Structures are given as C-alpha cells and as structure tokens.
UniProtKB/Swiss-Prot annotation:
Group of enzyme by EC: transferase
Purpose: Catalyzes the transfer of a N-acetyl-glucosamine moiety to 1D-myo-inositol 3-phosphate to produce 1D-myo-inositol 2-acetamido-2-deoxy-glucopyranoside 3-phosphate in the mycothiol biosynthesis pathway.
Species of the source: Actinosynnema mirum (strain ATCC 29888 / DSM 43827 / JCM 3225 / NBRC 14064 / NCIMB 13271 / NRRL B-12336 / IMRU 3971 / 101)
Gene: mshA
E.C. numbers: 2.4.1.250
HAMAP family to which the protein is assigned, alphabetical: MshA
Protein name per Swiss-Prot or TrEMBL: D-inositol 3-phosphate glycosyltransferase
Catalytic reaction(s) noted: 1D-myo-inositol 3-phosphate + UDP-N-acetyl-alpha-D-glucosamine = 1D-myo-inositol 2-acetamido-2-deoxy-alpha-D-glucopyranoside 3-phosphate + UDP + H(+)
Quaternary data: Homodimer.
InterPro entries linked: Glyco_trans_1, Glyco_trans_4-like_N, Mycothiol_biosynthesis_MshA
Residues noted as binding Mg(2+) in the record, renumbered to the chain: Y305, R306, A308, T332
C-alpha cells in the first residue's frame, strides 16, 4: 500500500473539533492519516474549501496532504445543502487525480455518506477499491431522535444504501454498528469489518487534578461535571443541564461547590453562541453554575477532562464516543447514555456508569453516585485509565491497512473474474 485517497467532503481535518460540523470524525481522519504516513503510506485528504484564503494544498503532517476542493460558495452552506455540490466536488477530485499517472492511488477511503457518493464514482473511474466509514447512519439516528431534532431526509437514507451496496469494505466502529449495517441496510456481512477507533495516549493522560483546576480558574474543592462536544440536539447537553437543576433541588448546599463545564460550539453555519442552552440554564435557575467554554485544543481539552469529577456523554446516539475514551484516558469516569457504541467505550460499573434513556432523575442519580462518592470515583478512575489504554490509533491504523489490502484483493478478483 503506497497511496490512499481520503474523502471528507463536509468537514476539514484542519478544523477544530467541537465547532460547526467538526467532531470525532475529524479526529479519526487526522489520527489515522498521520499514523499511516508514519508507516510510509502517502495520504491525500480531499475536503471542501470553506475560505478563499485556503491554499489549494496544505501539509497536515509529513506524508499527509489536505487538498481543498472548490465546490459551491465558501461560506453560508448548511451541511444539508451539500448534496447539491457533490458534482462540483467530484469533478475537483477527478481533476486532481488526472494530474498523476494512472493507478496513482491504491484505495479510496470515504468518510460519511456524502463522501461515499464521491468515492463510489472515484472507484469506477480510478479502478481502485472503495472503503467506507459511515460514522453516523440516518436510519439509526431517526430511531433515536431528540424531541427538538429533525429527522434525516429520505435523500440521505437512499444515498447511504447506495454506498453500502457499492463499497468493497465497510468499516464499523463496533459490533453494534456492524449489526446496524447488515440489519438496517442489508450490507453483505462479508464486507463489514469492525475496527474500533483509538485515543491519543500521548496527549490524553492522567495528570494533577489540582493543577488542571487552577488552569481553568476552578476551586480545588469544587464539584466539577463536564460535557464536551458540539452543542446540538443529538449530543443532548440539555440532559446535563436538567440533571444539574435536579441535583441542586435535592441538595441546595451543593450550589456553592458545583461547576458544570459545557465545552464546545453550536453545530451549524452562522451560529456563534449556544443561545438555547444558555436560555435553558437560566430558566432552570442554574446559570450561575453552568460555564460555557469554546472548543479546546488537545492540551487544553485534556486539562478539562482532568479537572472534572465526571464527564457526561448523554448523546441520543453515538457510533462510538471518542469523548468518553479521551476522558477515561485522563483518569476521569464517564456517565454515558447506553446507546450505540458507548457501552463499548464505557464499561458500566467498571470505568463509569451507563444510563438507560434520558430521564432527568436517572441522570441526576448517576452523576451524584460518582461525584458524591469519592471512593467509587477513584475506583472507576483507576479502571478507566487501563480500559482506555486498550485503544490506540496505531492499532486502528493497522486494522485499516489490513482492510485496504483485503479490499484490493477482492476488487482485483472481481475485475479479473
């Protein structure tokens, strides 16, 4: 394997996770691409240009290039409008490849269904296998919608079905996602490979909690709960805010110590502040304990995790949940919704607690169990570090490279059959 073309239409690996549409997928693309480059595999990532000031090609790391493809206006486009720009994006990708000798890429790896549509055509034009990672699935999301969330359109469902049918290999984060691909999308089980994501074990490590709190301006004896992620209905930060109100109603004395950190930005074009969540905190009378922080880079984010007594991941659906893994790698227990891949990322009663559903009282119970029981918290924290160390991006990358090799072999057999 010499060269890999990676497609990430709707979000650039250069963007800060936690802003707009940037999240765990960005981390996944960056970490696996750089790990491949360390193994001598050249990686070229194609993403949509969102500014006229972006260079046509940028170096993410030695051996990893990011190619900005002009497809539609640089700003003002919602993700839901991007299907209308797939023709322009695909043309840009094909033009870039045409500058090389035939057979330049060994495989194309698409991320999310929009990229899968582009990868489908690239597969046919370039004569190389297509490996696809969905990251989220419309049918799964529609089965677990938040009250304020809009269902995914039929257009996306059809697009995903097409990509699932055409890809040579489908990468699932967990066995649960693999079952969803075969059960909901009729994927050929032989094409589905389970490859768990990793965590940056050099960046997310246990550290001095007191120092972490000082860096964030928090009192040493504060009771700190944290949410990290994009502020959108799917991620359900409102669940933590409501649980905070329930905790204070049960024990008003906690107000002097309790700090709830909400770290992330609103998801969507043109949004600057999490207005609805701020309004909810005010209406529930907890605005004085809820602090909103912008998305944090790796080192600063690790300090947030270390400072917290517990990290809440109340999502309505997660294909895996990288935030849960990062927090545990820092020695912080996680309270997570028992959905999607989170039961794999968090071992219930061992590294954190899983909550069935999103009822406020259940979340308040789980958070108080950890935060108000130092013995339990320390036991979970110790186990969490060991659990997280079982996941690494190097291991993920080795599995992906093996999947690429399998896809190439199968593709060649089909071509020469």
């Amino acid at each position: 394997m010499k060269r890999v073309a990676v497609l990430s239409v709707h979000t650039s690996p250069l963007e800060q996770p936690g802003t707009g549409d940037a999240g765990g997928m960005n981390v996944y693309v960056v970490q696996t691409a750089t790990a491949m480059a360390r193994r001598g595999v050249e990686v070229e990532i194609f993403t949509r240009a969102t500014s006229s000031e972006l260079p046509p090609v940028a170096e993410l790391a030695p051996g990893v290039k990011v190619r900005h493809v002009v497809a539609g206006p640089f700003s003002g486009l919602e993700k839901e409008e991007l299907p209308g720009q797939l023709c322009a994006f695909t043309a840009g990708v094909l033009r870039a490849e045409a500058r090389h000798e035939p057979g330049h890429y060994d495989v194309v790896h698409s991320h999310y269904w929009l990229s899968g549509q582009v990868g489908w055509l690239a597969r046919e034009r370039w004569g190389v296998p297509l490996v696809h990672t969905a990251h989220t699935l419309a049918k799964v999301k529609n089965l677990a919608l938040a009250d304020s969330d809009a269902p995914e359109p039929r257009m996306r469902v059809i697009g995903e079905e097409q990509v699932v049918a055409e890809a040579d290999r489908l990468i699932a984060n967990t066995d649960v996602e693999a079952d969803q691909l075969t059960g909901l999308y009729a994927a050929d089980p032989a094409k589905v490979l389970v490859v768990p994501p990793g965590v940056d074990l050099g960046r997310f490590t246990p550290g001095d909690r007191g120092e972490a709190r000082r860096s964030l301006g928090l009192a040493p004896d504060a009771l700190v709960l944290a949410f990290v992620g994009r502020i959108q209905p799917l991620k359900a930060p409102d669940v933590l805010v409501r649980a905070t109100a329930a905790l204070l109603e049960r024990d008003p004395g906690l107000r002097s110590r309790l700090v709830v950190l909400v770290v992330g930005g609103p998801s969507g074009s043109g949004m600057r502040t999490p207005d609805e969540l701020v309004g909810l905190a005010r209406s529930l009378g907890v605005a004085d304990v809820v602090r909103f922080l912008p998305p944090q880079g790796g080192g600063s984010l690790a300090q947030v995790y270390r400072a917290a007594d517990a990290v809440a991941v109340p999502s309505h659906n997660e294909s895996f949940g990288l935030v849960a893994l990062e927090a545990q790698a820092c020695g912080t227990p996680v309270v997570a919704a028992a959905v999607g891949g989170l039961p794999v990322a968090v071992r219930d009663g061992v590294t954190g607690l899983l909550v069935a559903g999103h009822r406020t009282s259940d979340w308040a119970d789980a958070l108080s169990r950890i935060a108000l029981a130092p013995g339990l918290r320390e036991a979970l924290a110790g186990n969490a570090v060991g659990h997280a160390r079982g996941f690494s991006w190097d291991r993920t990358t080795e599995s992906l490279l093996a999947a690429y090799g399998q896809a190439r072999d199968v593709f060649r057999e089909e071509v020469y059959a």
